[in-house]
Regions:
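Extracytoplasmic/secreted cell-surface and envelope-processing proteins
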Residues: 35, 121-123
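Alpha-helical segment that forms one wall of the substrate-binding/catalytic cleft
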Residues: 57-120, 129-139
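Cleavable N-terminal signal peptides of Sec/SRP-targeted secreted and luminal proteins
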Residues: 2-18
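Secretory-pathway extracellular proteins and peptide precursors enriched for disulfide-bonded cysteines
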Residues: 14-18, 25, 127-128
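Short, functionally critical alpha-helical segments immediately adjacent to catalytic or ligand/cofactor-binding
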Residues: 19-34, 41, 52, 89, ...
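A general alpha-helical scaffold signature found inside nucleotide-binding enzyme cores
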Residues: 47, 127-130
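Secreted/periplasmic proteins that engage bacterial cell-wall peptidoglycan
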Residues: 28-73, 85
Length: 139
């Protein structure tokens, strides 16, 4: 029984490390992992480490938002805070992962992050996924 517990722990740690590498590579692809100011991207502003857009921030549950704080202010602040923006991405992925049947791991994370809820079905996310994959060597 101890052997199974150890094996489960090793698998859990391996998955956690792979996800960490995936998020780090997405950060590199998006901003060279720098807290960039907001900039226009495909008709709307993208901000911070992961180039988060306002609707994405709202979909991820507005982490870090203070009571009474305007959502735009919270979004810009969160996007420039690595921990807050990572929390946002994880919540977003958890919310929309069901939209990607047959996809898993870093491919699912990358395509949802880049293409939104339907990102796993969009041709335009393939090149983005290839950039992330070449960084981390993950699947």
């Amino acid at each position: 029984m101890l052997t199974i517990s150890v094996l489960v722990f090793i698998v859990y740690v391996s998955i956690a490390l792979a996800a960490r590498d995936c998020f780090q590579c997405i950060c590199q692809v998006e901003s060279q992992c720098q807290p960039l100011d907001c900039r226009m991207d495909m008709g709307s502003l993208s901000c911070g480490y992961f180039q988060i857009k306002l609707p994405y921030y709202q979909d991820c549950g507005t982490p870090g938002r203070h009571s009474g704080e305007p959502v735009e202010e919270a979004w810009k602040r969160c996007s420039k805070d690595y921990s807050c923006s990572l929390q946002c991405i994880k919540a977003y992925i958890n919310r929309y992962a069901r939209m990607c049947p047959g996809k898993g791991g870093c491919e699912l994370i990358s395509k949802l992050h880049n293409g939104g809820p339907n990102g796993c079905h969009l041709e335009r996310t393939v090149g983005y996924w290839q950039k992330v994959q070449s960084c981390c060597g993950c699947a």
